[in-house]
């Protein structure tokens, strides 16, 4: 299924039904009083978070969503039927933004969470309502209210515990497939991953969700490559796992490229707990691995975990550390 994480839609509550002008007409009661009923309410627009959804594709090809109108009132003081509410299911993690994108109206972060964004219009009043001691036969009624309407943006930010970051071809998708049952596309060329992938890690009777986003390049926060579109998906992550390809020529520069992009995009990303690891260590000798660890660790003042997604070397230790950090946060 195509991954869509942004959509602009028009939503409108149902109109209220009109009130009715009616008078009793029964045998032997030639001058019956008013009996016009009120109109029914218009339907509401309701958003619901659904954990079984992971894309906004349902809003790509249909842009207008209208709740049902209320029915008009009827004689014998019958109130019109209310319009049905329109329920719009969206993935958990969906934000509803104003038309100018400057205001977050609501953030659906839980499965089953509901938000009534628009109320339907009230039903109009029938002529029974206007009967008084000085007006026994009112011919007055009111029309139903027009339902509110607005344009809104839907932004999906995936909910995960761990976000994987790194340059293109750093081994993120291979790592995800090694630790979860996720099956992302894997190939030996940059930008194999074009959409975020999610997987669940099970360890020591615990579990956590890992998100793999497309590789970042310098200038990602300005729209270079694919990064600026997908960086938002790791904003909600509790910790970041930064993968460095040990076969790359300039490891220090590669490290700072990613750190600079995270910092430039959001201060919240800059300050998140980061776990750093070397990938593809099965391609290097122990001497080379140790040399690169000694070269880089003192400079960045970080522990680096050497791993191989192919042989599973170092994976168990890394996952245990990730779980420990999650339990602290």
UniProtKB/Swiss-Prot annotation:
Obg domain boundaries: 1-159
EC number(s) recorded for this UniProt protein: 3.6.5.-
Cofactor section: Mg(2+)
Subcellular location as annotated: Cytoplasm
UniProt cross-references to Gene3D superfamilies, sorted A to Z: GTP1/OBG domain, P-loop containing nucleotide triphosphate hydrolases
Top-level taxon of origin: Bacteria
Protein's GO biological process: ribosome biogenesis
GO cellular component terms given for this protein: cytoplasm
The keyword Nucleotide-binding belongs to this UniProt entry's keyword annotation: yes
Sequence positions that bind GTP: 166-173, 191-195, 212-215, 279-282, 308-310
Keywords, comma-separated and alphabetical: Cytoplasm, GTP-binding, Hydrolase, Magnesium, Metal-binding, Nucleotide-binding
Main location: cytoplasm
Residue numbers binding Mg(2+): 173, 193
MF terms in GO: GTP binding; GTPase activity; magnesium ion binding
Pfam families the record matches: GTP1_OBG, MMR_HSR1
Domain OBG-type G: 160-327
Family affiliation: Belongs to the TRAFAC class OBG-HflX-like GTPase superfamily. OBG GTPase family.
Subunit comment: Monomer.
HAMAP family with a match to the protein in the record: GTPase_Obg
Matching NCBIfam families: Obg_CgtA, PRK12297.1, PRK12299.1
Function recorded in the entry: An essential GTPase which binds GTP, GDP and possibly (p)ppGpp with moderate affinity, with high nucleotide exchange rates and a fairly low GTP hydrolysis rate. Plays a role in control of the cell cycle, stress response, ribosome biogenesis and in those bacteria that undergo differentiation, in morphogenesis control.
Protein name: GTPase Obg
Organism: Orientia tsutsugamushi (strain Ikeda) (Rickettsia tsutsugamushi)
Gene: obg
